[in-house]
Each structure stands twice: as C-alpha cells, then as structure tokens.
Amino acid sequence: MYQGHMQKSKEQGYGKLSSDEDLEIIVDQKQGKGSRAADKAVAMVMKEIPREESAEEKPLLTMTSQLVNEQQESRPLLSPSIDDFLCETKSEAIARPVTSNTAVLTTGLDLLDLSEPVSQTQTKAKKSEPSSKTSSLKKKADGSDLISTDAEQRGQPLRVPETSSLDLDIQTQLEKWDDVKFHGDRNTKGHPMAERKSSSSRTGSKELLWSSEHRSQPELSGGKSALNSESASELELVAPTQARLTKEHRWGSALLSRNHSLEEEFERAKAAVESDTEFWDKMQAEWEEMARRNWISENQEAQNQVTISASEKGYYFHTENPFKDWPGAFEEGLKRLKEGDLPVTILFMEAAILQDPGDAEAWQFLGITQAENENEQAAIVALQRCLELQPNNLKALMALAVSYTNTGHQQDACDALKNWIKQNPKYKYLVKSKKGSPGLTRRMSKSPVDSSVLEGVKELYLEAAHQNGDMIDPDLQTGLGVLFHLSGEFNRAIDAFNAALTVRPEDYSLWNRLGATLANGDRSEEAVEAYTRALEIQPGFIRSRYNLGISCINLGAYREAVSNFLTALSLQRKSRNQQQVPHPAISGNIWAALRIALSLMDQPELFQAANLGDLDVLLRAFNLDP
C-alpha cells in the first residue's frame, strides 16, 4: 500500500513555485498488522525535468533510489519527509529539532506542529481565490492514528511548510492532494504572498500522486477516516477519478518493478562473485593436492618403464625429448649444468629419471635446475619427489624451502627448514630437546606464516649458529637468511647471506639470494651489483638475469630491463634450436615482465610483438644477437 504527500515550493522572493521544483519523498514501510517498523525505510529523490512534457502534459521524471537502512522491502509506504517542514531562515514558528535529514515519523508521535496556525479569516480569503485551492487526503482505515501538521509563513522569506496527514494502518489508499498553500501576514512592508504568485507558477507546478490499490472495492467503500488538524484551515476533500487512480497505480507499479529489478540484478552479481570465489578456491585446493601427490608408485614394473606413466603425471616431461635413450644422461646433464645450459640440463635430467624413476639425485638436480630456469612449480614437484625417495637430502630440503618462499607458501617453507634441522646429523638433537614446540611438525599450506611457528624455527637456527661459535656453516646461514626474509627482517637476512658468502664466494645461487633480499629491502642498486656478480660466475643463470631485469624496472632503467629479459629468452631458445627441441621450457614470467617494461617505455609496436611472442623482431629492435 502506498500513501504519500508531495508538495514543495521553491520561491524567488516569497514562496514562488517553479516547474523544476525538487520533490523529496521519504518512503516508510510497515510490516505486520497494527505495527510499523520505523527502522526500515527507503529514500527516493525525484526531480522534474522542465521543457520536456509527456503526452499527458506531465513533466518527465527521473528517479533514483537509495537504501536507507540495511534491507529494502518490497511494499513500501510513502510518507512525507521531515525536510519538507524545515525552514531555511529564521521563523517565528516553534519547531522541534530534527536530527536526521530523512527522519521517519514513528507511531509515538501524535502531532508534529512546526508553526502556528494561520487565522481563519486569512484561510477563507485565500480559499475564495480560484488560483489557490486547498486539498486533503481522505484515508479509509479502521482504528488508525492520524498525524496532522500545519504551518504559517511569517517574517523573512521562508520555505513554505506543508500540511500532511499520515494514516499508519497498512490497509490504506492514497488519494489526490491538490496544492495546499498557506499564506501568512507579513511584518515588513505589507507584501502579501498572493500578489507574488504568478499564473505560470500555478500552471507549471504539477502534482505527483502515488496509489497502491491492493484492497477490494468493499474495503475502499466501507472504511472510515478522520482528519485530525489543530490548524484553523479547512481542508476540502476531493475524490479522484478512476482514470487518475489507474495512472497513479501504474506509476507505483513501475517503481516497485524497478526496485525488484535492482534487487534481482544485485542478487545475480552477488551469486557470480560467490561462484568465482568458489571456483578459485577449488582450483587452489586441487593445485595443493597435486603438489603433494605420490608421483611414482612403488611398483617395480612402473619404475622400469621408460615412457611417461600415470604415476609420474605430476611432473610434465617433454614428450619429444631427443635424449630419452641417451646413455649416461645424468652425467651429461651435470656437465651441461656447469656450462650454464639450463634447458638442455633439464632434458638430460628428465631422460635420466625416465631411465631410472627412483634416482633421487636426478630428481634433486632436476628440481634445482628448474628453479634456476624460472620454473618454480616444476621445481617444487621434482624436489618433493626427491624427498619422498630420500628424506634426508639436505640440499633438496633447502632448495624446496627457497622455492616455497618464492611462491608464497610460507608455512611450507618453515616446515622444510625445520625438517632440514631435523634431518641434519649436526643439529637434529636441537629438535628433540624442543619436541613440545607447537605447530612445527604439521603440514602447512599457502597462507601467512604463523608467528609462533616462525619464531620457533628461528630459535632452532639461532641456537645452532650459537653452538657453532666462530665457525660459519654456509648452509645454516642460508636457512637463517630465508627465515629472516620470511619475517621481513631483510637487514638481518642480508647479514646471514653475506656470512655464507664469506665461506662460498663463488656460489652464484647465494649471490642471487642476496640480490633478491636487497631488492625486497628497497636497495635495488645494491641488488644489481649482487645479480651482476652471480651472472659473472654463471652467465647462463636465467633466474638471476630475470631478477636483474626486475631491479632495472624498479630503478627506471626500462631499456636495460628489456635487454635482460630478451637475453634470458634468447638463451632458452638458442639451447632449444641447437638440440632440435620443438617445445622449449620458456618461462611465461619472463614474457610477462618484458611486456611490462615495454609498456613503460611507451613502445606500442614492440608491445604488440611481445604479445605475439615474436622474439626476432624484439631482438632486432634492441640490436641483440638472435
């Protein structure tokens, strides 16, 4: 059911109405019989657009709705806004303070009197004028309360208040209100408001009526209403025509339909977001399950197979490996690794594993090489398989901890570092003495590391370093550097890696880890020096070349960054061409970083070449050897 009253005058001087007046309707809603939920309301702002009238000579309306409280009901009751009774300037009327711009009248208010009533003589005088008519709203409801307000214009030019009648019963009918104009006597220079009202303002101001005829005809004819007014003005009841009610009903139905459409659209969008979230959560769970799967069964026949089997489906082998039957593939792979030819090293290690799936050392070097070739996911799978075959492989544990750190699996990184201490003959007694430490032996997932777990593992490493005294264990210092990196203590991590480098100054992987920690600590210039040193030792170290390009981007050296990315891609492709490998292990991360650098250089044609993967065009553009 709808019930509403809309009348607002916007005056130039004294109360002059115009055709572009703003109408504000406060929508109040009630649920249940004989009660009203004052805490649920909908506010709507409606503005008339001048100079564009419809066929019925009604100004076109644009409407926007806003949810005042948390829930929007489907059948609102329209009630006038408290703002309609506010005066912009000083008034002699005694008004009650209003604390909200869109306050809602509650059933506890029997009367809202904002100004003194006008005199009866003035009302009758104005009533006699044909251009100024009064109107009323007749409510048909049983046992309903009635709220009436009157206002008078006095003193300085004011906004003209309105007289309204609210029926709080849910079974009500909205009927027509004509313009109710109250004119007060003026205190200065005797300017009556009736003389300042023009005929254009009377004809330009249009009424907007709302109706919701949901009751049967007997209810409409059998109801009674009372008009409780404390003003001296007389309200004339005007019965609306059936055609007008039908039109008003269409307007109300259109508003309800629009509200329902907005609600349905919101629900559809919400469902889509929830569906996307569930999809990615499921994908994440599947990826984690895949990473933990037993890749090779203990079946002896499966171990002797040379082809790719279902037991090895967690790691994606190259299907056209030219070295699949190469004798001594593992030794040849180690030779290529020393030369810095990472893509070919990967092919030889895969061939060695296909020849002997239980070769833990081949899995170890395959994982380490994949990480250096900027393929972290494949590295994690290979290192996990190595540890399944050889749980005390310390190099694999440390490399796995680094890969977990790079992929954001901080809890798993802590677990791997703790297992490194546990499997190390020199330090495993420390774990036994701290057997009660919480959370150190549980399987972890991709989430921010628990502070208690991280601190517990750091205590183990610090105690082990203290036991060593002046002797520096580079592997222990490397693990300590990773732990400090996880906790964001980059300066302490830098100290740990530098300590390890004092023992292994030619370890290019340590120089790369030092550079990454410097870069994460906002020391990109020093990081460039560390990466450069790593590349001097191992020119084919693709990961360090990629990291160097990232630091160049951070320093604003975009051309140098592009040059490093192209060099890394060229190394991967050159190795493939020499060995006639149709599908090289080229990292998508490098292409993504290359596109970022090219976009920062404002080179759209080169950016398009990067999108197409046209490496030759890019190499020629930067004068690099193919």
Swiss-Prot record:
Membrane topology, from the record: Peripheral membrane protein
Coiled-coil regions listed: none
Keyword Transferase carried by entry: no
Organism domain of life: Eukaryota
UniProt keyword annotation of Cytoplasm present: yes
GO (cellular component) term, any one: peroxisomal membrane
GO MF, any single term: peroxisome targeting sequence binding
Record's keyword terms, sorted: Cytoplasm, Membrane, Phosphoprotein, Repeat, TPR repeat
Ranges: TPR repeats: 326-359, 360-393, 395-427, 474-507, 509-541, 543-575
Subcellular location: Cytoplasm; Membrane
InterPro entries, per database record: PEX5/PEX5L (IPR024111), TPR-like_helical_dom_sf (IPR011990), TPR_rpt (IPR019734)
Tissues in which the UniProt entry reports expression: Mainly expressed in brain. Also expressed in pancreas, testis and pituitary.
Biased composition (Basic and acidic residues): 181-198
Biased composition, class Low complexity, residue ranges: 225-235
Residues where Phosphoserine is found: S205, S253, S257, S261, S445, S447
UniProt main location, coarse: cytoplasm
Gene Ontology biological-process annotations: protein import into peroxisome matrix, docking
Region (Disordered): 1-20, 118-167, 181-235
Subunit structure: Interacts with RAB8B. Forms an obligate 4:4 complex with HCN2. May interact with the C-terminal PTS1-type tripeptide peroxisomal targeting signal (SKL-type); the relevance of such interaction is however unclear. Interacts with HCN3. Interacts with HCN4 with a 4:4 HCN4:PEX5L stoichiometry; reduces the effects of cAMP on the voltage-dependence and rate of activation of HCN4.
Family according to the record: Belongs to the peroxisomal targeting signal receptor family.
Biological role stated in the UniProt entry: Accessory subunit of hyperpolarization-activated cyclic nucleotide-gated (HCN) channels, regulating their cell-surface expression and cyclic nucleotide dependence.
Protein name, entry field: PEX5-related protein
Originating gene: PEX5L
